[in-house]
């Protein structure tokens, strides 16, 4: 599970805070829409192993990249 909060789109950049699993403090993602790549990712301390969580978050950001309106938050769950 990963929670995305403060999702913001500014031209070709989407940024958000992300909380993998039970993290109390957020990490931060910056995703470049034009290049389809993460240009910055800061994991929350102690959650540096959460590459899978980052991948799910980026997949979601990519899927909404061309939407006119961004949600402010999103909960992503998988099994």
Where are these regions (language model features)?
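Acidic, low-complexity intrinsically disordered segments
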Residues: 28-79
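N-terminal acidic leader/helix
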Residues: 2-34
